[in-house]
């Protein structure tokens, strides 16, 4: 059951990424049709913009991410218990030892960052280290180590970059149309050409809806990677109860004291900001109740 769940989560992520690239291609083709009278040119430009965004974000410095989240690096002497658990989980996962950071915050939370296992880091709040026992900490750190081993940070970064690219292309296309960039096409099409009018309307609709759809796909990818990391943590620790108990404590945690931006919020094991009341479709994290239920059903 454990390996089946891991496999299903990976497959869902692949499907979502394929849909994401298809959406980027669609928005590029639509913008190309409306502004350049050339589907192919718009499609190529969209993919190039997407790749530039993804590449620039993937190689963002680990130290910069930690600095943005008020995390300070610690040595084995400063936090031996935490350090050794990270070391043990990294050894079991067969990845290099990540750098270890602590965030001075009473809330219960942790996250990992780094585009590859070779430049990864793990951070935990002081609240988490104080409240959780060893088996619960192993579950949490196993979750973060799994994000590193599964290249989740890279996948999530690509998703954020693609969502940003879709939004930028849609915004540029909309502004150019508003200021007359599409007037030539509107004159050439003619009211009697029904097919062209339908194509024009569909292209406009895709420009309007693409940013929302892109955001929903990005958030869905983030939620799937959380489920995968939970299951992968159990694979590393061989102790589902440790992860379940940790999630039960995380469920009761207060929001973090310092502000957390959207990109950083998706990295944490638990939503670091005040819980929102709207649909889970717009959440970076699946409900903890569902995460616990999945672990119990393994």
From Swiss-Prot:
Domain of life: Bacteria
Subcellular location: Cell membrane
Any one annotated GO CC term: plasma membrane
Topological category with respect to the lipid bilayer: Multi-pass membrane protein
E.C. designation(s): 3.4.24.-
Gene Ontology MF term list: metalloendopeptidase activity; zinc ion binding
Keywords: Cell membrane, Hydrolase, Membrane, Metal-binding, Metalloprotease, Protease, Transmembrane, Transmembrane helix, Zinc
GO BP annotations listed: proteolysis
Broadest EC class assigned to this enzyme: hydrolase
Positions that bind Zn(2+): 143, 147, 226
Active site: 144
Alphabetized InterPro entries for the sequence: HtpX_protease, Pept_M48_protease_HtpX, Peptidase_M48
Family assignment from sequence similarity: Belongs to the peptidase M48B family.
Protein name: Protease HtpX homolog
Lineage: Bacteria, Bacillati, Bacillota, Bacilli, Lactobacillales
């Amino acid at each position: 059951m454990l390996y089946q769940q891991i496999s299903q989560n990976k497959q869902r992520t692949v499907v979502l990424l394929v849909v994401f690239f298809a959406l980027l291609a669609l928005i590029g083709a639509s913008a190309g049709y409306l502004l350049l009278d050339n589907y192919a040119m718009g499609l190529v430009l969209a993919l190039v913009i997407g790749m530039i965004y993804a590449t620039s974000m993937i190689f963002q410095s680990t130290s910069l991410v930690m600095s943005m989240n008020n995390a300070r690096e610690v040595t084995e002497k400063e936090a031996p218990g935490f350090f050794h658990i990270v070391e043990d989980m990294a050894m079991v996962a067969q990845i290099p030892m990540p750098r270890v950071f602590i965030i001075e915050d009473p809330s219960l939370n942790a996250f990992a960052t780094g585009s590859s296992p070779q430049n990864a880091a793990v951070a935990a709040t002081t609240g988490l280290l104080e409240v959780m026992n060893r088996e619960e900490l192993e579950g949490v750190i196993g979750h973060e180590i799994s994000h590193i081993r599964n290249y989740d940070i890279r996948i999530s970064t690509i998703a954020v970059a693609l969502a940003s690219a879709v939004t930028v292309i849609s915004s540029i296309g909309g502004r150019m149309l508003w200021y007359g960039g599409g007037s030539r096409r509107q004159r050439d099409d003619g009211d009697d050409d029904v097919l062209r009018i339908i194509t024009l309307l569909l292209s406009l609709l895709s420009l309007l809806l693409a940013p929302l759809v892109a955001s929903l796909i990005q958030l869905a990818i983030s939620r799937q990677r959380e489920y995968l990391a939970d299951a992968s943590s159990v694979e590393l620790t061989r102790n589902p109860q440790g992860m379940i108990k940790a999630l039960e404590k995380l469920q009761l945690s207060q929001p973090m004291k310092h502000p957390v931006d959207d990109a950083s919020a998706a990295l944490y094991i638990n939503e670091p900001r005040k819980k929102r009341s709207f649909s889970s479709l717009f959440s970076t994290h699946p409900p903890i109740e569902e995460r616990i239920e999945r672990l119990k059903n393994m």
